[in-house]
Amino acid sequence: MSRVCTMTGKKANNAYAVSHSHRRTKKLQEANLQWKRVWWSEGNRWVKLRISTKAIKTIEKKGLAVFAREVGLNLNLY
């Protein structure tokens, strides 16, 4: 399974690791993804999602149903 947030679509960023002597090697900066069980009140059940920590904060602020509607996510599939 790829490391992509189901709500925001966040994924890894290509970057350089720069040493003290300024040698550059490629590295991946992965998104901080968590498996999170969130209560979906409209569906009256738990939904298990792989989401970023920023998406967790947004769900706490707006609510799961509103945020899913904004990003166009069908919660019946989860």
Curated annotation (Swiss-Prot):
GO cellular component: ribonucleoprotein complex; ribosome
Gene Ontology molecular-function annotations: structural constituent of ribosome
Pfam families assigned to the protein according to its UniProt record, in alphabetical order: Ribosomal_L28 (PF00830)
Keyword Membrane applies: no
HAMAP family for this protein: Ribosomal_bL28
Keywords noted in UniProt: Ribonucleoprotein, Ribosomal protein
InterPro entries according to UniProt: Ribosomal_bL28 (IPR026569), Ribosomal_bL28/bL31-like_sf (IPR034704), Ribosomal_bL28_bact-type (IPR001383), Ribosomal_bL28_sf (IPR037147)
GO biological process: translation
SUPFAM superfamilies: L28p-like
Protein family (similarity comment): Belongs to the bacterial ribosomal protein bL28 family.
Highest taxon listed in the record's lineage: Bacteria
Protein name as it appears in the record: Large ribosomal subunit protein bL28
UniProt KW Ribonucleoprotein keyword: yes
